[in-house]
Amino acid sequence: CSRKNKINCFACVWSIEDLKTLASVSNEIVKIPSPEAYNLELIKEALKTFKKVVISVGCLNQKELKKLFKYKKKNKLIILHCVSAYPLKPEDCNFKKFHYLKKIFKNVGYSGHMNGIEDAIYALANKAVMIEKHFTTNRNLQGRDNKFSLNEKDMFKITDLREKFYNFNIDRGLGIQKKEKDIFKNYRGRW
């Protein structure tokens, strides 16, 4: 399921020690969570060690965010627009910041804490390279996250939409497509 739908599982690291422990298991992808996104030492080490580095920028002030600009050309870096509030209200999603980040960084995604999938759909429609949502098998379980986490059905909806949005953006040129030739040939100028 996760390979077929291109769903990657990864872990957050909160320290250099965590980073080294995770790297001993896999050096594919690591996430620096919002509260640690100011930690340039951790970011530098992650960029040296991992193939992909995801940084959630929810808790950064403007000055701290600008310090990340020096990494803007790194292909292995994915910046996640995030608002660190649980659960997040639609009016607090602040997608203006998402669009601002897209002007600066090559790879911008979205980490959503809103109930439902509408925020993820918006991010996908605006070409987010990655969507991160919390996942649960049961929304009635204890804990803050389970109340706004996605279930399996929601996750499949997002992966299906991601595929459709990708297909919407395939460049087919400006001329007549093969699929249109029958209509063009048989109906044009008919009336």
How does the language model describe each region?
Residues 1-191:
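Catalytic cores and adjacent flexible loops of soluble metabolic enzymes
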